[in-house]
Design a protein with these regions (language model features):
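N-terminal Rossmann-like NAD(P) cofactor-binding module of classical short-chain dehydrogenase/reductase
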Residues: 75-78
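NAD(P)+-binding Rossmann beta1-loop-alpha1 motif at the extreme N-terminus of oxidoreductases
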Residues: 1-70
C-alpha cells in the first residue's frame, strides 16, 4: 500500500482518488483554495458538488498547510 497525497480537490484531483483507492492505496486529499470543498468532505457523504458524486469513504482529507508536505508520502499529485 502506497501513501498518496493529492493537492487540489477539483474535478481532476477528486477523480484521481477513485483508481488510487481501488488499488488499495492510502489516499489523502487537500484543497488549498476552496474552503467549501473541505466542508463538504467533512460530511459523512463526502459529496463533490462539481462532479455530483460522493467520493470514496476511505478517502482522507486534511486542511492544507505547508507542514502537510513534511509527512512521508510515496506520491504527491498536484492537481491545481
Amino acid at each position: 500500500m502506497k501513501k498518496i497525497l493529492i493537492i487540489g480537490g477539483g474535478a481532476m484531483g477528486s477523480a484521481f482518488t477513485f483508481p488510487c483507492i481501488d488499488n488499495k492505496n492510502e489516499v489523502t486529499i487537500t484543497e488549498p483554495y476552496n474552503k467549501t470543498f473541505i466542508k463538504n468532505l467533512s460530511s459523512k457523504k463526502k459529496y463533490h458538488s462539481s462532479l455530483k458524486i460522493n467520493l470514496p469513504n476511505k478517502l482522507k482529507y486534511k486542511k492544507y498547510s505547508t507542514h502537510l508536505l513534511n509527512n512521508k508520502y510515496d506520491l504527491v499529485v498536484v492537481a491545481l
